[in-house]
Amino acid sequence: MAHPVQLSLQDATSPVMEELITFHDHAFMAMSLISFLVLYALLSTLTTKLTNTSITDAQEMETIWTILPAIILILIALPSLRILYLTDEVNDPSFTIKSIGHQWYWTYEYTDYGGLIFNSYMLPPLFLNPGDLRLLEVDNRVVLPIEAPVRMMITSQDVLHSWTIPTLGLKTDAVPGRLNQTVFTATRPGVYYGQCSEICGANHSFMPIVAELIPLKIFEMGPVLTL
């Protein structure tokens, strides 16, 4: 999870998040190069005596500043489109879990395990144990398997919410009357934190998400054993 004064992204826990980090570095290098070139042009203009201030036609310059930005945009767009395809791809998920947003808590339903349903509320500060994270702990974590494709069906019962876990590269809107889906494959066990990422009312900041990722063999014994 993130920590104070962290400048980089969180460590990836899914292939999609690894792709997002790579794309972030790719785009950052492109923006850094553009910023350097613009700064160099500005400094050159300020420090160089202009010898011709009445240029009315510069065909080569116009060609360069038209083609070069187009090439840069293409180089940024291609990996972005690939990631968009990966995030929307659904390849025969092994498990389906439904997440329903409320003001201001989440409800989870394990449709593959007899319709197991439970609510997940933020723990008040008085109920926290030593080492627990303030405003991020919940009474019931959503338990998910690793190394298996999981489909999350996400919706809302009242207003707009957004189910988000950064380390998994997940952010899917929960829209009333609409069922959105996202598929992911976690790569390592652990406890990972997220929050509702859509302003949903007075207690929007008190709507955390905690996912506990466990080995597939343990999960197949039944998620109720880990709740």
UniProtKB/Swiss-Prot annotation:
Binds a dinuclear copper A center per subunit. Its main location: mitochondrion. It is a multi-pass membrane protein. Coiled coil: none annotated. Cu cation A2 binds at residues 196, 198, 200, 204. Its cofactor is Cu cation. GO terms for cellular component: mitochondrial inner membrane; mitochondrion; respiratory chain complex IV. It is found in: Mitochondrion inner membrane. Component of the cytochrome c oxidase (complex IV, CIV), a multisubunit enzyme composed of 14 subunits. The complex is composed of a catalytic core of 3 subunits MT-CO1, MT-CO2 and MT-CO3, encoded in the mitochondrial DNA, and 11 supernumerary subunits COX4I, COX5A, COX5B, COX6A, COX6B, COX6C, COX7A, COX7B, COX7C, COX8 and NDUFA4, which are encoded in the nuclear genome. Component of the cytochrome c oxidase, the last enzyme in the mitochondrial electron transport chain which drives oxidative phosphorylation. The respiratory chain contains 3 multisubunit complexes succinate dehydrogenase (complex II, CII), ubiquinol-cytochrome c oxidoreductase (cytochrome b-c1 complex, complex III, CIII) and cytochrome c oxidase (complex IV, CIV), that cooperate to transfer electrons derived from NADH and succinate to molecular oxygen, creating an electrochemical gradient over the inner membrane that drives transmembrane transport and the ATP synthase. This is Cytochrome c oxidase subunit 2. It comes from Macaca mulatta.
